[in-house]
Amino acid sequence: MVVLSEIPGDPNEDNQNENPQEEVENLPILLQLPEELIASIVALIPRCHYPSLSLVSRAFRHLITSQELYVARSNLGFTEPVLYALIGFQAYTRPSWFFLRRSNFPLQLHRIRSLPPMLSGAAVVTIDYKMYVMGGCIGYNHPASSNVIVIDCRFHTWKYLPDMKRARCRAATGIIDGRIYVIGGCKKQDADWVEVFDVTTQSWETVPSECPNDANENGEFITYVVMQGRLFILDLECCFSYEPVQGLWESWDDGSELMRFWHSSSSCVVGDLLYALDLTCALEHPIVVYYPNELVWRPVMGVDTAHLPILTEYTSTLANFDGKLVILGGGDCSESSSEIWCVEIALETRQGDQIWGVVKSVSIVSRDLPMRHVIELCRTVMV
């Protein structure tokens, strides 16, 4: 089951029904322990239990919202994956962040109220517990933005980072060798079509590079992935890759094997292999996987349409959830139903290099989103 995260309440809020005397009487043993030891003990408890733990006392409420606890979780290697989704609604409405969480109820998708609405077409990457959100625009025919923010997913707080050198919307981005590369999202211009962000020095640098001739003039892309140390970019009529170490580009046209099934955002990379949703079942299965070394697509065995809810490719998104495959989406949002489903699929290799999938869970995670919502992207963060 995709058990993700629960964000506790504001530690500054006082419970009017609390009895301060009772709380003091319950704390002597706890207060005798070193704070570092307390944090190490609580760090071993899954985050989904933190809301219940916060009811014990003010001290616990403070602890589970402290940076020390998350440092302890990281040091102990007890971080957990959390799935985030950027969901937009009607045209010209800025999308908002949602995340999946579980407490004592079934898995549910919840809006993060502490984060402001994002720009549509923003490029997003994750590093540990942080999400970097770059560029975007309010809507079609609106100016692009060069703004960059970083979101701390432990506390759902955010701050601005230095702007990119160019304003970009629907750019491609990926992390290679610990640095964030951003490509396109603006009209082709060799001098600064590619930028790189150093997360240590918090600075942007232009990467001189010749634009691939096949890329569209506006530089707006459908989706992007990182595979084998290269940033693969899906354009409107072609796809291409960029290898930053040597600055090499490679292109594939619409008739290539790579673009046979890679034609929408319902795709992601797991274990350096590209997975895509193909509800036409051209290979007799709804999920296919691309082997870049062999330049061939194969079906993911063990998963059939009977195992999945009713989905459409343009309303569904794939994500790498800590080595598992997650499908977040639903059917035609123009119909009366606006349900969003979450499907978790474990992946394993059998019989040489054949990928098999095992459906671990299928659940409705939202029933009340507005009609015609669009899941722009999904990202997994470790917290």
Curated annotation (Swiss-Prot):
Keywords: Kelch repeat, Repeat. It comes from the Eukaryota. Coiled coil: none annotated. Pfam families: F-box, Kelch_FKB95. Kelch repeats lie at residues 130-178, 179-224, 226-272, 274-317, 324-370. Residues 11-21 have a biased composition (Acidic residues). Residues 1-21 are annotated as: Disordered. Transmembrane segments: none annotated. This is F-box/kelch-repeat protein At2g29830.
